[in-house]
Amino acid sequence: TVCMLLCMLPTVAFASGSDYLKIAMLDSGRKYFSADWVKAFLYEAKADGYTHVMLAVGNDGMRFLLDDMSLTVGGKTYSSNAVASAIRSGNNAYTTASSGEWTESEMDEFFATAKKAGIEIIPLLNSPGHMDAVLYAASSLTGTNCSYNGSSRTIDVTNDTAVRFSQAFLQKYVDYFAGKGCRYFNFGADEYANDRYTSGSMGFGSLQNSGKYGYFIKYVNELAAMVKQAGMTPIAFNDGIEFANKMSASVGSTTYTFDRDIVVCYWSGGWSGYTPRTAANLASDGFRIINTTGDFYYVLGKNDSFDNGYTYAANWSNYKVCGTSLSASSVIGGMFCMWSDYPGAETQTQEAKKIRLPLRAMGLAMDGAYTSGMDTSVVPGGFNADGSINTDPPAQSHDYRQTASTAATCTEAGSVTYTCADCGDSYTETVPALGHNYAAADDAGDTIYTCTRCGE
C-alpha cells in the first residue's frame, strides 16, 4: 500500500547505533532555497544517514522571518513590519543574486517534514559576524552605526546599541527554535570582520590588538547563556574561540573566559597570520568538538574537492579533525557543509544535481560505510539525478505507539506491542520475567522466605 511505502526507508540508508552526530549543513542564509527544495533536502539527508540538518537561517543574509518581528531595544519598540522591512532591505543590500525569506508557517512545515523523515533540525543564526542583513537593519532602525570599523557584516561588540539590538533579535529565534524542540542552536561567532581585515590575523587580531577581545568573549558567553536558558546546547565555529591561544581577556576589571559548554565546530586550523587554537588544545580545554574539517566543504561558486564527483569522501575520518586525530570522547559528531559563498553561481536545481551524491558519500563515510561503488539511486521525495525534486512518496519514520501489553510475572515473561499509527506495521518486545523477590520472616524460630510480588 501507499502507506506502507511511506514507512519504508530507501535502500541507501545505513542504520547506526552510534551517538555520533551526523550533520548536513545548508547555507541557506547567503542563498534562498524554496520551501519545497528544503523539504526534499531533509528527505535526502535522512536517507543518506544523517541525524541532523543544520539550516543557516542567518548567515550574511537572513532568510527566515517570524510572524512577529517586533523588537524592543533600549526602551524603544520597533514594529514587526518595520523590522521585517529592514531585514528585506538588508538582504537586498547584501546581494541581488538571491532573494526571498521563509515565513514562519513554512518553517513549521520544515519541522513537520523533519519529524516525518525522522531527522532533527539545528538552526544556525550567525552573530556577531556574518550578519549583513541584521547589521543593516540594526543601523537603519536605531540610527546608530552598529558596524565594527566599517565592516558590512559584523557588529561592534563594544557598542551597546549594536549588542542589545543583535541579542534582542537572536532571542526571538532562540525562543522559536526552543519551542520547536530543537536540542542545539549554532550562533556561529566566526570570521569577525574578515571583510574589513583581509590579511594577517584579520578581525580577531584587530580585536586583540586593540584590547577589545574581552568584549567578544563576553558577547559569545551571553549568547551561550541565552541558548542554555532555553534548554538547548550552544554551538559555535572554532576560529574565534581562544584565538591565537588567548585564553581570557578583560572588559574593565572583569576577566572573561569562554563558556566550555559551547560545542565547537572545528573547521580550520588557520593559515599564514591567522592562528586559531588547535583542535587538540580546545579538546584538552574541555570543549566538545564537531568535526567540520574545511577540506570537505562544498562551496557554491568555488573549486572544491566535490566539484567533479564524490570519491573525496573516502578521505574522511570521524575523529581526524583538520589533520589531527582526537579521541572519540572529544569528537561528538561530524558535519558536511554546503556553503553558498557565491549565491548566484548556480540555481538550486543545479546545486541539487551537484551535491546529491557528495552528500550521500559523506553521510556513508561518517557511518564507516562509504564505497566508491555506492548506490546512486534516487531518494523518494528527495532529488532526481538532474537536480529536480522527486515527487514519489517520501520515506518517513514509523510512528510507533503502544497498543497492547501483558505484564511480566515472577516466572513468566510479559510483552509490549507497538503499532505504527500511519501504516499499521507492528512489533512486539518481550519483557523478561521479574524473578522472585524473597523476603525473610521469622516464624516461631523458623525462617520463612516469601516472595513480595507473588506470595510464593
Predicted features and spans:
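Active-site neighborhood of glycoside hydrolase catalytic domains
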Residues: T158-V263, W267-F287
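Flexible, acidic glycine-rich loops studded with aromatic residues
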Residues: A249-P393
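Short, acidic/polar
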Residues: K31-A45, T275-T278
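An active-site-proximal structural segment forming one wall of the substrate-binding cleft
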Residues: D48-Y50, E106-P128, S152-N186
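Sec-dependent signal peptide cleavage junction
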Residues: M8-G17
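Extracellular modular ligand-binding repeats in secreted and cell-surface proteins
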Residues: D392-E456
